[in-house]
Amino acid sequence: MSDITYLQLQSIIDHMLSTGLSYSSCKKVRTLISQLFDYSIINCWCTTNYAKFLNLGHNKPVRPHKPFTTQAINRLWRLGPPLHDIPLILLYTGMRASELINLKARDINRKQRTMRITSAKTKSGIRTIPIHDRIWSIIERRLDAVYVIHECRTYSSLSREFNKAMRAINTKHTTHDCRHTFATRLDNEGANYNAKRLLLGHASGNVTDGVYTHKSLGQLRKAIRLLK
């Protein structure tokens, strides 16, 4: 720890900010570094906690999530593959970008046309999502590779491909706007409340320990099919 300099640490923070990491995420990293330095000082491994001097810049307010309009979704369909693949999969599954990046072909059940999310951070996030009929051909076309989105193995690469599609249809959205749109559309179509929570990976009192009964899967399919 005594060999680590302030400039080295600040350059790490600067790089994180330049790649689009949020202020709150960088603050958590600074807190962790500070705790490591405090522990090192107690054990006489160093004498100064440089984390206290790290500059995170200004905490800019995060843009509120904006749902896609029906017109924008229709423009995505007209855009065609492969450019429209990522946004449409996100829009019709409600997945997080990180979940899509980690989705493997083996997680897809061809017979039942479902996908199993296993890379979630929480227990409730591990879930099964029925695949909407409209995006089945997109998914099926990608099942020869190990990963469904084989061309994007990092968030930054997925974000680049997503932004290409947004520019092509002349709109501005984030990947998380797709998840927000998914939830909003289900609400607008009167989807079952518990089905919506299960699809999004939120905890629900009706389904325990991640066990999906035939009935609950049927409810999920019914909810998914409400999306046009």
At which residue positions do the language-model features occur?
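N-terminal core-binding DNA-recognition domain of tyrosine site-specific recombinases/integrases
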Residues: 1-39, 43-45, 152-157, 172-177
